[in-house]
Each structure stands twice: as structure tokens, then as C-alpha cells.
UniProtKB/Swiss-Prot annotation:
GO MF: fatty acyl-CoA hydrolase activity; lyase activity
Known catalytic reactions: a (3R)-3-[(carboxymethyl)amino]fatty acid + holo-[ACP] + H(+) = a (2E)-enoyl-[ACP] + glycine + H2O; (3R)-3-[(carboxylmethyl)amino]decanoate + holo-[ACP] + H(+) = (2E)-decenoyl-[ACP] + glycine + H2O; a fatty acyl-CoA + H2O = a fatty acid + CoA + H(+); hexadecanoyl-CoA + H2O = hexadecanoate + CoA + H(+)
Effect of Y66F: Loss of acyl-CoA thioesterase activity
GO CC terms: plasma membrane
Effect of Y33F: Loss of acyl-CoA thioesterase activity
Species annotation: Mycobacterium tuberculosis (strain ATCC 25618 / H37Rv)
Effect seen on changing N83A: Decrease in acyl-CoA thioesterase activity
Pfam family, one: FcoT
The family this protein is said to belong to: Belongs to the FcoT family.
GO biological process: fatty acid biosynthetic process
Lineage: Bacteria, Bacillati, Actinomycetota, Actinomycetes, Mycobacteriales
Quaternary data: Homohexamer. Trimer of dimers.
Disruption phenotype: Cells lacking this gene are shown to be highly attenuated in a mouse tuberculosis model.
The name this protein goes by in its record: (2E)-enoyl-[ACP] glycyltransferase
Length: 183
């Protein structure tokens, strides 16, 4: 999936409408970040089909969790924000049994496997114009989910994400996830 694929597919999913993700669910899923003082996702909305998830999120990075402020959004923060939006978007899809291959998981199963069983297999990022870390947004699209039957059975999750701010700051990434221990 390439960056150019994001907009047409997003229009199709968005036409079905996204719904807000409840703060209670965000708090539960983002607890591993909150406990370290690096929850950057303020709020999010999502929609899902049997093999795709679309999400929008608003972020703020008041203080970087790992370094003094660089004054701009960087690669480490891109991955942290991607993780937060992806974890948050898949949680209600699991809860509502919208993704066929994950229908055997409860929300408790999802949270139990969230950190230990969801891996980044590949990642690339692109920074077009410096992004203000104080206030920015993102759009995430994961589609064409596929169960891979190898030594380790896993769910391949190809994703693209775009970040922007109100001053024209822009960054994007292509990330492939592997979800292990799937039902």
C-alpha cells in the first residue's frame, strides 16, 4: 500500500461515517503511555470493515517523553503517535466484532495482547514540512488485513498514516504490523 492509495480508499470508508472512540476506552488502551507521561492522543474517531480500519486523531506533545524538545515532530514521535492511534482504532473494532479475523478476541484479550503481540515489521517515514508538536492531527488507514500461515501465524496489517498541522506541517508513514496470537 503506498501513500497515493490513502485518499481514494479513505473516501469510501469515510462515506460510512466515523464515530468517536469513548474516552474510557482510550484511557484503557493508552494506559501504557499514560503511566509514563507520554499519552499524546487527545481524542479519536474510527470506522471499520471486515478487513480495514480508518481513524482520525488529534494530538499534542507537551513535552517529549525521551528527549528535550526539538521544537518539531520527529521520527520517534511519529511511531509513538502511530501506535497510539492504531491501538485506539482497533480497540472498538474488536469490541464491536467488526474485523472478521479478530472476532474471537474480547476487549480483555486485545488489551492483554496489545503490547506483547503487536509488532512493527516494517516502517518508513517522510517529513515534508516541520510539524508543530503542540497541536496536530492524523489520519490512519489499515487495509487488506491478511492472515499469514508460517512458523508463526499472524495477522499482516498494512497501514499508512498522514500527519498535518494548521500551518501546513506534514509528515507521513507506511507501517506494516504483525499481530500475533490471533484467534
Amino acid at each position: 500500500m503506498s501513500h497515493t492509495d490513502l485518499t481514494p480508499c479513505t473516501r469510501v470508508l469515510a462515506s460510512s461515517g466515523t464515530v468517536p472512540i469513548a474516552e474510557e476506552l482510550l484511557a484503557r488502551v493508552l494506559e501504557p503511555y499514560s503511566c509514563k507521561g507520554c499519552r499524546y492522543l487527545i481524542d479519536a474517531q474510527y470506522s471499520a470493515t471486515e478487513d480495514s480500519v480508518l481513524a482520525y486523531g488529534n494530538f499534542t506533545i507537551g513535552e517529549s517523553a525521551y528527549i528535550r524538545s526539538t521544537g518539531h515532530f520527529n521520527a520517534v514521535e511519529l511511531i509513538l503517535c502511530f501506535n497510539q492511534l492504531a491501538y485506539s482504532a482497533f480497540a472498538p473494532a474488536v469490541l464491536n466484532e467488526e474485523i472478521r479475523v479478530l472476532r474471537g478476541w474480547s476487549i480483555d484479550d486485545y488489551c492483554q495482547h496489545q503490547l506483547s503481540s503487536m509488532l512493527i515489521r516494517k516502517a518508513s517515514s517522510r517529513f515534508r514540512k516541520p510539524l508543530n508538536p503542540q497541536k496536530f492531527s492524523a489520519r490512519l488507514l489499515c487495509r487488506d488485513l491478511q492472515v499469514i500461515e508460517r512458523t508463526w501465524r499472524y495477522l499482516k496489517v498494512p497501514c499508512v498514516i498522514e500527519f498535518w498541522d494548521e500551518n501546513g506541517g506534514a509528515a507521513s508513514g507506511e507501517i506494516e504490523l504483525a499481530a500475533l496470537n490471533i484467534p
